[in-house]
Amino acid sequence: MDRLCLYAKNIMKKINQKYFKKVLGKFATGVTVISINNKEKFIGKTVNSFSALSLSPPLVLFSLDRKASAIIKFKNCEYLSINILNKKQINISKNFAEKNAPWNKTDVSYYFSKNKTPIIKNCLANLECKKIKFLTEGDHIIFICKVINFTYNDNLKPLLYFNSKYI
């Protein structure tokens, strides 16, 4: 481990995680459900750590907790969908945000794309992606994905998350 990395690790030990999480909550984000196809069953996870990475090629990234119950399935998938939720889809977000909730949901309206990724209906936008790679940093795994198809709806309002609350 180099000196800079060791220095950063010592600094982070001094930062209270509760307050650090509170500080990060001051950044308003959109809300997504990342979904994969596992033997023709819908598996999803609510994620607000979604970001554009590159326009050329079209790349995006998101991260999941290393201890997430379906992390192995996400690491092993080839294709996935990033569903950007609209303001009226708060219950979908809550369903997939639960830590110990069942992963297979039958009450979510969706269809499978040409690459068999689950696309949640009536979203603000949907991105169909091919997973390029993933890497572990801290307590999360960062997924880098190439966008291969997308849809969007200009007539919907976004679901936002700020200060640990939906807005």
Which residues fall in each region the model found?
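Basic, polyanion-binding surface patches
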Residues: C5-I167
